[in-house]
Amino acid sequence: MNIGCIVQARLGSKRFPKKILKTIKRKTILEIVKSRLEKIKSVNTIVFAIPQNKKNHELEKFLKKKNFLYHKGSEKNVLQRYYFTAKKYQLDIIIRITSDCPLIDPYLCEKMLQCFIKEKCNYLSNILKRTYPV
């Protein structure tokens, strides 16, 4: 089973442009997010889903330089971007991640993933109704 994290990433934030390329202790937010996702034991693919436009060319260059997997798709239709990213990398289960969350908890993600598999869910979330941790 191919389990992957798809990280939704873009540079076009109006409040804090390019925030995902800003650094904390010499690591970009994106690098921190990826390193935390790598701690999710059951995940075997981490891929960035980025908009296909000139505004995100710098992001694409960064991802290439770091040898991070990525897929470009619609800026406006994020669901479509996820769909084609999952299809390209043949993902059976997707964990949806936002790129501006350097405090993502890999242990909570693993716990939710195991719940998803055990209960044979179609969809699992802890934000529709706040139920932290699971």
Predicted regions and their residues:
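N-terminal nucleotide-binding beta1-loop-alpha1 segment
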Residues: 1-17
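A short, N-terminal amphipathic alpha-helix
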Residues: 29-46, 59-61, 65-66
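Short, high-confidence coil segments that cap the C-terminus of an alpha-helix
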Residues: 43, 90-91, 118-122
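A conserved acidic beta->alpha catalytic loop
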Residues: 51-56
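Conserved donor nucleotide-binding strand/loop of the catalytic core
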Residues: 64-76, 87
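Short beta-strand-to-loop acidic/aromatic patch adjacent to the donor-nucleotide binding site
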Residues: 85-86, 90-102
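Conserved core of the sugar-phosphate nucleotidyltransferase
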Residues: 104-134
